[in-house]
Amino acid sequence: MESYDDDLSRFEAEGAVPLPDTTEQGYVENDGARIWYATYGSGSPVILLHGGLGNSGNWGYQVPALVRSGYRAVVIDSRGHGRSTRDARPYSYELMASDVLAVMDRLNIEKAALVGWSDGACTALILAANAPTRAAGVFFFACNMDPSGTKEFEFTPIIGRCISRHRKDYAALSATPDKFDEFSEAVGLMQRTQPNYSANDLAQISVPVAIVQSEFDEFIKREHAKYLARNIPNAEFIYLPSVSHFAPLQRPDQFNAAILAFVSKVLS
C-alpha cells in the first residue's frame, strides 16, 4: 500500500526518493544560462518540468514510473534552479521555454510530451503555444495562465515544509548557495506578473492539453483551471482528490496514473 505524505513531513526531512543513476546528463548553454538536464530509460520522450523554487529531484517518484512504462524520462533544472544558472535578467516563462527547446535540440528530441508542475506547467504550455510541432501534448498541473487565476497567498505548515526543503536543496545544488532569498524574490516577481494569456491566446493552442487540478491546491483557483479547460480547444479537465499543490509528492501513485493515462494517448 502506498505511504502518503500529505503534510510533506517526509519531503521536508528527506526530499523525494533520489533520481535513478544515469550516464546521460549534462549542461546546455542557452541565452545567458547553463541548463542542467538528465535522461532515463528509452522510448518516446516525456519531459518533466518542476515548479518554482524546486529542482528536478522533486520528480523522484515520477521518473521510475515512466521508465517502467517504457518511456524516456527527461528532467531539466529550470534556469536559476537546482544546478542550472541564470544571468541578471528577470525571470520569464518565455526564456524558460527556450531553455527546454535547447535541451530538446541537444538530445535530438524532435517532439515530446510535456509534464509541467506549477511554474513548469506555464513553461510547458508557452512552449506548446510557441512551438506546437515540438509538443505532443501538455499535462498542465497546478498553474495559472493569467494573474487572476491565483488565490490570495495564505501561509500554511505544508507550504513552510516545502520551502524548507527547497532552501536545503538550493544550498546543496546551486552555484550561488547563499542566495536563496534573492532567488525566491526574483521568481516571485515573475509569478505575480506572468503569464498573462487572454482567452483568445488560449484558443490558439493546438496541441492536446490536460488541465489538472487538485482538490486542495493552495495557490490556484479551481474556477481558473476549469476556465483554461473550456478555452483551450479540446482540453480535458482532470481532478485529483485528497491532494494539494504538491500532489506528485503527497500521493505519487495517483499522480503517476494520471500522467501515464495522458501520455499513453498523446504518444500512441
Predicted features and spans:
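Conserved HGGG/HGGXW glycine-rich cap/lid loop of the alpha/beta-hydrolase fold
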Residues: 33-83
